[in-house]
Amino acid sequence: IATPYKVLRRGRIAPLERVAVFGGGGGLGIQMLKMARWANCHVTAVDVDKSKFAACLEHGADICVDATSNNAHEALLDASGGGFDAVIDFVSSTKSLEMAADSLGTGGRLLTLGGGGGSNADFKLNAMTLLNKEIEVMGSRYCSYQEVLESLQLVGEQADKGLMPLVTRTSGFDGLEDIHNDVEHSRITGRAALVL
């Protein structure tokens, strides 16, 4: 929850804003959906795995968009009413960053947190679009010790309202390799935890 907590602050995400989360079914993505819902935003989950959509809807998304669909761009514009106020990209591949930037509305903010599949992904953003729409592009990495403490306090205060990290799979050391493989291949919705 600490990283999504930081993203809310860094992105100046406010109640009733239209927010898209790319990689919404992933470990950080699903936590971001929960935080954006807690912040009273209109939330769209974007993912390539439709099997994760039910969990996305259950944990904060109002709508889900299949990033592999031929009409993904139109679906994003429809979901946002013409453009998002903030897009949070946990994938940060060339394709996702360009799709995210294209779906921003005037004054929109793009926050990138992913490693582009382990690569240094480049993406194109038209200078006139950046100027005319007054788009902001921000990187965000990790969270501070203070943000961890603040997010833990928030979870303690809001746990009864569903603001808890979503752990969908646990294992001891004997299943560690299987969990690592499933995380690496995006087969886990939410988080996996090692139980000692």
Language-model segments: residues:
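Residues in the short beta-alpha loop(s) of Rossmann-like NAD(P)-binding domains
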Residues: 49, 116, 143
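C-terminal hydrophobic helical "lid"/dimerization subdomain
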Residues: 98, 145-196
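Structural detector of well-ordered beta-strand residues that form the stable sheet scaffold
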Residues: 20, 44, 109-111, 138, ...
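Mid-domain Rossmann-like dinucleotide-binding core that forms the NAD(H)/NADP(H) cofactor-binding site
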Residues: 1-69
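Aromatic/hydrophobic pocket-lining residues that form π-stacking "cages" and hydrophobic walls in ligand
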Residues: 28, 32, 52, 76, ...
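Glycine-rich cofactor phosphate-binding loops and adjacent beta1-alpha1 units
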Residues: 11-13, 54-135
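Residue-level signal for nonpolar/aromatic packing positions in well-ordered secondary structure
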Residues: 4, 36, 56, 100, ...
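Rossmann-fold dehydrogenase core element
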Residues: 109, 124-165
